[in-house]
Protein backbone atom coordinates (compact mmCIF):
# COMPACT_ATOMS: atom_id res chain seq x y z
CA UNK A 1 0.00 0.00 0.00
CA UNK A 2 1.38 3.38 -1.02
CA UNK A 3 1.53 6.06 1.65
CA UNK A 4 1.33 9.84 1.26
CA UNK A 5 1.02 12.88 3.51
CA UNK A 6 -1.05 15.88 2.41
CA UNK A 7 -0.43 19.17 4.21
CA UNK A 8 -3.42 21.41 3.61
CA UNK A 9 -5.98 18.65 3.12
CA UNK A 10 -9.03 20.30 4.67
CA UNK A 11 -10.51 21.93 1.55
CA UNK A 12 -10.05 22.71 -2.12
CA UNK A 13 -7.24 20.99 -3.99
CA UNK A 14 -5.95 19.18 -0.89
CA UNK A 15 -9.36 17.77 -0.02
CA UNK A 16 -9.96 16.55 -3.57
CA UNK A 17 -6.48 15.07 -3.72
CA UNK A 18 -7.19 13.13 -0.52
CA UNK A 19 -10.38 11.76 -2.07
CA UNK A 20 -8.72 10.68 -5.31
CA UNK A 21 -5.64 9.16 -3.67
CA UNK A 22 -7.81 7.34 -1.12
CA UNK A 23 -9.87 5.91 -3.97
CA UNK A 24 -6.62 4.64 -5.50
CA UNK A 25 -5.85 2.77 -2.29
CA UNK A 26 -3.32 5.11 -0.67
CA UNK A 27 -2.90 5.23 3.10
CA UNK A 28 -2.92 8.95 3.89
CA UNK A 29 -1.74 11.33 6.55
CA UNK A 30 -4.13 14.29 6.47
CA UNK A 31 -2.84 17.55 7.96
CA UNK A 32 -4.34 21.04 8.17
CA UNK A 33 -5.13 23.77 10.67
CA UNK A 34 -8.91 23.15 10.64
CA UNK A 35 -9.08 19.79 12.38
CA UNK A 36 -12.88 19.59 12.29
CA UNK A 37 -12.83 19.62 8.49
CA UNK A 38 -10.14 16.94 8.45
CA UNK A 39 -12.22 14.72 10.73
CA UNK A 40 -15.26 15.17 8.49
CA UNK A 41 -13.18 14.32 5.43
CA UNK A 42 -11.72 11.24 7.09
CA UNK A 43 -15.22 10.08 8.04
CA UNK A 44 -16.26 10.40 4.39
CA UNK A 45 -13.25 8.30 3.40
CA UNK A 46 -14.08 5.51 5.83
CA UNK A 47 -12.02 6.71 8.82
CA UNK A 48 -9.00 4.79 7.52
CA UNK A 49 -6.45 7.60 7.45
CA UNK A 50 -4.31 9.38 10.05
CA UNK A 51 -5.49 12.90 10.90
CA UNK A 52 -3.37 15.56 12.59
CA UNK A 53 -3.78 19.30 13.14
CA UNK A 54 -0.91 21.52 12.02
CA UNK A 55 -0.44 25.30 12.11
CA UNK A 56 2.37 26.37 9.80
CA UNK A 57 2.65 29.72 11.59
CA UNK A 58 3.80 27.86 14.70
CA UNK A 59 7.11 26.66 13.29
CA UNK A 60 8.46 24.52 16.13
CA UNK A 61 5.16 22.74 16.65
CA UNK A 62 4.66 22.27 12.89
CA UNK A 63 8.08 20.65 12.56
CA UNK A 64 7.32 18.26 15.42
CA UNK A 65 3.88 17.45 13.99
CA UNK A 66 5.32 16.52 10.59
CA UNK A 67 7.97 14.32 12.17
CA UNK A 68 5.29 12.65 14.30
CA UNK A 69 3.06 12.05 11.27
CA UNK A 70 5.94 10.47 9.36
CA UNK A 71 6.70 8.25 12.35
CA UNK A 72 3.07 7.17 12.77
CA UNK A 73 2.39 6.50 9.08
CA UNK A 74 5.76 4.79 8.45
CA UNK A 75 7.43 4.29 5.06
CA UNK A 76 5.91 7.42 3.50
CA UNK A 77 6.58 7.68 -0.24
CA UNK A 78 5.05 11.07 -1.10
CA UNK A 79 4.73 14.33 0.86
CA UNK A 80 2.39 16.86 -0.75
CA UNK A 81 2.70 20.49 0.38
CA UNK A 82 -0.55 22.20 -0.51
CA UNK A 83 -1.08 24.74 2.29
CA UNK A 84 -1.41 28.29 1.07
CA UNK A 85 -3.34 31.49 1.69
CA UNK A 86 -3.87 34.58 -0.40
CA UNK A 87 -6.40 37.13 -1.52
CA UNK A 88 -6.45 40.50 -3.23
CA UNK A 89 -4.67 43.34 -1.43
CA UNK A 90 -6.58 46.57 -1.89
CA UNK A 91 -4.41 48.09 0.85
CA UNK A 92 -0.98 47.04 2.06
CA UNK A 93 -1.27 45.37 5.44
CA UNK A 94 1.81 43.95 7.15
CA UNK A 95 -0.16 41.58 9.38
CA UNK A 96 -1.73 39.95 6.32
CA UNK A 97 1.56 39.96 4.40
CA UNK A 98 3.34 38.23 7.27
CA UNK A 99 0.66 35.53 7.39
CA UNK A 100 1.14 34.84 3.67
CA UNK A 101 4.92 34.70 4.07
CA UNK A 102 4.70 32.47 7.17
CA UNK A 103 2.38 29.93 5.52
CA UNK A 104 3.30 30.05 1.83
CA UNK A 105 7.04 30.62 2.14
CA UNK A 106 8.40 29.73 5.58
CA UNK A 107 5.93 26.88 6.06
CA UNK A 108 6.83 25.31 2.73
CA UNK A 109 10.57 25.60 3.39
CA UNK A 110 10.16 24.04 6.84
CA UNK A 111 8.04 21.14 5.59
CA UNK A 112 10.36 20.59 2.61
CA UNK A 113 13.38 20.45 4.90
CA UNK A 114 11.77 17.84 7.15
CA UNK A 115 10.68 15.87 4.08
CA UNK A 116 14.14 15.98 2.49
CA UNK A 117 15.81 14.84 5.71
CA UNK A 118 13.41 11.90 5.90
CA UNK A 119 13.72 10.91 2.24
CA UNK A 120 17.53 11.10 2.35
CA UNK A 121 17.50 8.59 5.21
CA UNK A 122 14.88 6.49 3.41
CA UNK A 123 16.96 6.78 0.21
CA UNK A 124 13.98 7.62 -2.00
CA UNK A 125 10.77 9.64 -2.05
CA UNK A 126 8.84 12.46 -3.68
CA UNK A 127 8.09 16.00 -2.54
CA UNK A 128 5.17 17.71 -4.29
CA UNK A 129 4.76 21.47 -3.92
CA UNK A 130 1.64 23.31 -5.05
CA UNK A 131 2.70 26.64 -6.53
CA UNK A 132 0.60 28.66 -9.00
CA UNK A 133 0.63 30.34 -12.38
CA UNK A 134 0.80 33.46 -10.17
CA UNK A 135 4.51 32.64 -9.78
CA UNK A 136 4.96 34.19 -13.24
CA UNK A 137 2.75 37.26 -12.72
CA UNK A 138 3.47 40.30 -10.55
CA UNK A 139 -0.03 41.56 -9.83
CA UNK A 140 -0.36 44.82 -7.92
CA UNK A 141 -3.60 43.56 -6.37
CA UNK A 142 -2.09 40.30 -5.08
CA UNK A 143 1.57 41.17 -4.82
CA UNK A 144 2.38 39.20 -1.66
CA UNK A 145 0.63 36.07 -2.88
CA UNK A 146 2.28 36.26 -6.32
CA UNK A 147 5.69 36.85 -4.75
CA UNK A 148 5.20 33.92 -2.38
CA UNK A 149 4.37 31.58 -5.27
CA UNK A 150 7.39 32.84 -7.23
CA UNK A 151 9.46 31.84 -4.22
CA UNK A 152 7.79 28.42 -4.06
CA UNK A 153 8.54 27.63 -7.71
CA UNK A 154 12.10 28.92 -7.46
CA UNK A 155 12.78 27.08 -4.21
CA UNK A 156 11.47 23.77 -5.56
CA UNK A 157 13.61 24.20 -8.68
CA UNK A 158 16.62 24.70 -6.43
CA UNK A 159 15.71 21.68 -4.33
CA UNK A 160 15.42 19.60 -7.50
CA UNK A 161 18.83 20.79 -8.66
CA UNK A 162 20.31 19.96 -5.26
CA UNK A 163 18.87 16.44 -5.32
CA UNK A 164 20.13 15.86 -8.86
CA UNK A 165 23.62 17.20 -8.11
CA UNK A 166 23.85 15.01 -5.02
CA UNK A 167 22.53 12.03 -7.02
CA UNK A 168 19.67 11.54 -4.58
CA UNK A 169 16.76 9.36 -5.80
CA UNK A 170 14.26 12.00 -4.68
CA UNK A 171 11.70 13.47 -7.09
CA UNK A 172 10.73 17.12 -6.64
CA UNK A 173 7.43 17.89 -8.36
CA UNK A 174 6.27 21.48 -8.87
CA UNK A 175 2.59 21.97 -9.71
CA UNK A 176 1.50 25.34 -11.12
CA UNK A 177 -2.30 25.49 -11.48
CA UNK A 178 -4.22 28.22 -13.19
CA UNK A 179 -7.67 29.06 -11.80
CA UNK A 180 -9.26 26.05 -10.09
CA UNK A 181 -12.83 26.08 -8.78
CA UNK A 182 -12.10 26.01 -5.03
CA UNK A 183 -13.21 28.12 -2.03
CA UNK A 184 -9.98 30.14 -2.36
CA UNK A 185 -11.12 31.44 -5.78
CA UNK A 186 -14.20 33.41 -4.81
CA UNK A 187 -15.35 34.63 -8.23
CA UNK A 188 -15.70 33.39 -11.78
CA UNK A 189 -12.35 33.55 -13.54
CA UNK A 190 -11.24 32.80 -17.11
CA UNK A 191 -10.49 29.15 -17.91
CA UNK A 192 -11.70 28.04 -14.47
CA UNK A 193 -11.00 24.32 -14.12
CA UNK A 194 -13.31 22.00 -12.14
CA UNK A 195 -11.39 20.83 -9.09
CA UNK A 196 -11.96 17.16 -9.93
CA UNK A 197 -10.46 17.52 -13.40
CA UNK A 198 -7.54 19.61 -12.14
CA UNK A 199 -6.63 17.19 -9.36
CA UNK A 200 -7.00 14.18 -11.66
CA UNK A 201 -4.29 15.69 -13.87
CA UNK A 202 -2.16 16.43 -10.81
CA UNK A 203 -2.41 12.88 -9.49
CA UNK A 204 -1.50 11.45 -12.89
CA UNK A 205 1.58 13.67 -13.05
CA UNK A 206 2.60 12.83 -9.50
CA UNK A 207 2.36 9.10 -10.14
CA UNK A 208 4.37 9.53 -13.35
CA UNK A 209 7.08 11.29 -11.29
CA UNK A 210 6.84 14.42 -13.44
CA UNK A 211 9.02 17.31 -12.33
CA UNK A 212 6.79 20.17 -13.49
CA UNK A 213 3.03 20.02 -13.95
CA UNK A 214 0.86 22.80 -15.37
CA UNK A 215 -2.87 22.61 -14.58
CA UNK A 216 -4.70 22.50 -16.82
CA UNK A 217 -2.52 21.69 -19.81
CA UNK A 218 -3.30 24.99 -21.55
CA UNK A 219 -1.62 26.83 -18.66
CA UNK A 220 1.75 25.73 -20.08
CA UNK A 221 1.05 27.94 -23.11
CA UNK A 222 -0.06 30.83 -20.90
CA UNK A 223 3.24 30.67 -19.01
CA UNK A 224 5.15 30.50 -22.29
CA UNK A 225 3.27 33.56 -23.55
CA UNK A 226 4.02 35.49 -20.35
CA UNK A 227 7.74 34.69 -20.65
CA UNK A 228 8.05 35.93 -24.23
CA UNK A 229 5.79 38.98 -23.90
CA UNK A 230 7.42 42.36 -23.12
CA UNK A 231 6.76 43.58 -19.61
CA UNK A 232 5.20 46.85 -20.82
CA UNK A 233 2.56 44.90 -22.70
CA UNK A 234 1.73 42.61 -19.79
CA UNK A 235 1.26 45.70 -17.60
CA UNK A 236 -1.64 46.77 -19.79
CA UNK A 237 -3.63 43.77 -18.62
CA UNK A 238 -2.47 43.35 -15.01
PLM segments and residue spans:
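Residue(s) in the substrate-gating loop at a strand-loop-helix junction
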Residues: 132
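C-terminal helical subdomain
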Residues: 174, 187-224
Amino acid sequence: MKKAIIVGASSGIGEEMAKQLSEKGYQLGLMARRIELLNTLNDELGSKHVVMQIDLQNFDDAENKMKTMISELKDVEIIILNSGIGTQEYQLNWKYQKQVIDVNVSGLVLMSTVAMDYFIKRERGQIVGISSIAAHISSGLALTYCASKAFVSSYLNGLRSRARRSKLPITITTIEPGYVDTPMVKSEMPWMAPVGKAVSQMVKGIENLEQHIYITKRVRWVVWFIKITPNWLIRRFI
